[in-house]
């Protein structure tokens, strides 16, 4: 046994040594033995895409849903490393597509985040829940939106994913598009009924978020779709207040201010006067 608690069968699984693995199993090697990370030999076969060893381990009744220390199963690992054949094998052998890691991520969350379209299709074919929630309340569509993965987002929506799903803090997929400037996915979401004025629990709209992070393309997109520019969060901040928080103001902040003011000036003096009062109230 190594310092990381690898036994010989772990190493055979990692290296794809089917014959060696078979001999070790015949001599009663422990197929449920866990490394420091809680990985069984099947986890390692899944990680390194060693199909023959994975088949052998499963044929010898290795636990297909064994959990590592962070709750990941061999299926989570196969999906994370884009080893589709091993993922298919595990699903065929009744590995759960609903298994949740400690952060609540299912294999479908991982495929959505990593843009693994074929594996996502396979997981859905095996009954993966399209709106499964992580511990923070994020769905696979949240993650696809955040990463800008258009094809995955489209697949999830076609399978019935909720475009206005709210995480525990109230963030929707379009909020995450706004944060990361993923306009293409935002367009897809809006075309399928996403609310451009959705508010988080703290009252932040996608426009607040896009303005805060200096995402000019998303600001333009949201303004073109008629979002409210006068909305205030629970602290009384408008999208205009958010500009410059964490961005290079000279690079894009001025353009965002001008775009917002252009709209603000068309909705009357009341809001502008309120902004002026808030900016002057420094004492």
Residue positions per predicted region:
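Ankyrin repeat domain, specifically the short helix-to-loop turn at the C-terminus of the second helix
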Residues: 22-29, 56-62, 88-95, 121-128, ...
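Ankyrin repeat A-helix N-terminal signature
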Residues: 11-17, 44-50, 77-83, 110-116, ...
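Low-complexity, intrinsically disordered or signal/transmembrane-proximal segments
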Residues: 250-251, 278-279
